[in-house]
A protein has these predicted regions:
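Extracytoplasmic/periplasmic, Sec-exported soluble proteins
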Residues: 16-23, 40-47, 99-103, 124-135, ...
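Segments of small-molecule ligand-sensing domains
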Residues: 117, 122-130, 136, 140-194
Length: 194
């Protein structure tokens, strides 16, 4: 949709997989054979790691994009191989716990303390844990906005009326906004390259 009328000229191949497939190796080989120079690796974490590894192993060097859900250093890039993940691009919206620049950040330190207390077995390099924490903060905010009217209707009304909400574990400058016609909270991302 985003490519409009040029989509047929720009998309040279697509490949899908089933979650019951043992690997996505054959799909990657097929995509490489198409001559594609860009690879949108929109897979779940397990299969994204397999795809990253296979792309590297067969010597294919496309510009590679992965979705936020498959960009976790701990859950995807380490299993794929860090050296095999160099150059991967994603859209980010949370402070990545594997990024050393946030090591002394107050919000990051608060999250680490929370992880140690409530989820000590959790992977502190997995940004999906940060996302879960932030999702809980958003929910707490919405419930607070409901005050004493804790009905589904009021919760949905509050969810449709978020204006410039910020939490310190989102990337600086990211603001959450919703409306009655668009309940998606995340509308801003920053491109990041590993």
């Amino acid at each position: 949709e985003a490519l409009g009328a040029k989509a047929d000229q720009m998309i040279v191949a697509t490949a899908s997989y089933e979650v019951t497939d043992p690997t996505v190796d054959s799909q990657i080989v097929t995509l490489q054979a198409s001559g594609a120079d860009t690879f949108f690796n929109f897979a779940t974490p397990k299969f994204a790691a397999q795809a990253i590894r296979k792309v590297y192993d067969i010597g294919w060097k496309p510009m590679q994009f992965v979705p936020f859900s498959a960009s976790s250093v701990g859950a995807v890039l380490v299993p794929a191989g860090l050296e095999k993940s160099i150059g991967i691009i994603t859209g980010g919206f949370v402070k990545d716990p594997a990024d050393p620049r946030w090591k002394n950040d107050a919000a990051f330190q608060e999250w680490l303390a929370w992880m140690k207390k409530y989820y000590p077995e959790g992977d502190v390099t997995d940004q999906l844990n940060v996302w879960g924490y932030l999702t809980a903060q958003v929910m707490a905010h919405l419930l607070t906005q409901c005050r004493d009217d804790l009905t589904r209707e009021n919760l949905m009304r509050q969810a449709a009326n978020v204006k410039n909400l910020q939490f310190p574990l989102y990337l600086p400058g990211l603001k959450l906004n919703t409306s009655e016609t668009d309940l998606r909270l995340i509308k801003q991302m920053q491109l990041m390259r590993f």
